[in-house]
């Protein structure tokens, strides 16, 4: 279980709304040499194309490094364009339009889950156990099935929808991927609900980016706001996040499953919010029990070490501890270690046949660098 950092009236907690304070690793009980050695390994290319490493401890930056990769030249010799926002276009990946906004890919899903929690707390969504298809009256599935009608918001958050879906057995550049086909379609929601059901909802985990798009539509339908606008008003403004970009689908919905672009420092704010149980300063941004519920009833995944919560991966470590992992294609990783007061962010673009940064390695490097425990 997560042992969340206490946030009750502790005036010593630093809230980086206006920006992160920078300090030394040693002053915050971490070994700088260990962090530097890991950074050097990342920069060498041994673990693929890494764009940045950022480590927060006790609410301060203790290590930060960005690495240079010549994606313009690389894209000229690899792949073909695929989709409107293809993976081989340097104007879209890994940075947005020559800015420092980095693609988050499926890390976007964790933000979407937070929006659902806020909407439930605000009364826009009745509960986690509400039937999600009740909000899709404008759509009619070409594969009607009572199992789809029984699907709850909780089932969608935990990727146990029961929908027949495959996006993990092939590269994301493969046109037979359900995710790619969805992104190539004119109406992503219609594509998702047209897929046949394979299981009872809640029965089996199956990673499904289309499920997260259902949540985007749900937010729009229940709050009257596009997801991007809802997140801006109810999340980003509290955290002081002003510089971002979010892609939209052909029908105008926010691309909730992979369309967010952020700077690493702003992504770390989101992790810091979860580290502090959804509280930011004197403001309870997320429902008080939302972070706890994120991992309270984890589902098993196809990887024995990983479990899945509300659009977050859960990684056990130490004696009965759990790290939160927000993960996205290409090497986007944010690891939250509440017991150690650490948030670590890694960005990259490892979509090629190269070794890649492993989440367990990244987590263990952070744990091993702690010298005050």
Where are these regions (language model features)?
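N-terminal leader/targeting segments and the immediately adjacent pre-domain N-terminus
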Residues: 1-96, 122-125, 186, 190, ...
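Active-site-proximal alpha-helical segments within enzyme catalytic domains
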Residues: 211-218, 258-279, 332-348
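Short clusters of small/polar residues that mark proteolytic maturation junctions
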Residues: 66-67, 130, 338, 348
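Active-site SXXK
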Residues: 59, 82, 89, 100-128, ...
């Amino acid at each position: 279980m997560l042992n969340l950092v206490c946030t009750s009236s502790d005036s010593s907690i630093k809230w980086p709304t206006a920006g992160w304070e920078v300090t030394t690793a040693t002053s915050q009980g971490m070994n700088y040499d260990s962090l530097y050695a890991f950074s050097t390994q990342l920069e060498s290319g041994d673990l693929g194309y890494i764009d940045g490493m950022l480590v927060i401890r006790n609410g301060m930056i203790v290590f930060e490094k960005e690495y240079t990769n010549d994606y313009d030249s690389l894209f000229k010799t690899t792949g073909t364009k695929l989709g409107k926002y293809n993976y081989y276009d340097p104007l879209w990946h890994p940075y947005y339009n020559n800015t420092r906004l980095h693609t988050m890919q499926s890390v976007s899903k964790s933000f979407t889950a937070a929006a659902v929690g806020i909407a439930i707390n605000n009364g826009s969504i009745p509960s986690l156990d509400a039937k999600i298809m009740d909000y899709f009256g404008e759509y009619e599935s070409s594969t009607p099935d009572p199992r789809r009608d029984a699907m709850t918001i909780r089932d969608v958050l935990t990727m146990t929808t029961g929908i027949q879906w495959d996006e993990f057995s092939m590269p994301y550049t493969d046109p037979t991927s359900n995710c790619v086909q969805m992104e190539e379609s004119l109406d992503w929601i219609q594509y998702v609900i047209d897929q046949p059901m394979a299981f009872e909802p809640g029965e089996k985990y199956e990673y499904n980016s289309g499920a997260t798009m259902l949540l985007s539509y749900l937010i729009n339908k229940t709050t009257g706001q596009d997801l991007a606008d809802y997140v801006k008003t109810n999340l980003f403004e509290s955290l002081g996040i002003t510089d971002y970009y979010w892609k939209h689908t052909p029908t105008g919905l926010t691309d909730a499953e992979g369309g967010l672009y952020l700077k690493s420092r702003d992504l770390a704010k989101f992790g810091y919010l979860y580290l502090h149980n959804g509280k930011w300063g004197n403001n309870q941004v997320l429902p008080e029990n939302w972070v706890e519920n994120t991992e309270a009833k984890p589902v098993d995944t196809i990887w024995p070490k990983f479990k899945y919560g509300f659009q977050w991966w859960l990684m056990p470590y130490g004696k009965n501890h759990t790290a939160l992992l927000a993960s996205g294609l290409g090497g986007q990783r944010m690891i939250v270690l509440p017991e150690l007061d650490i948030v670590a962010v890694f960005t990259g673009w490892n979509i090629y046949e190269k070794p890649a940064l492993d989440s367990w390695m990244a987590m263990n490097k952070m744990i091993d660098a702690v010298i005050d425990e």
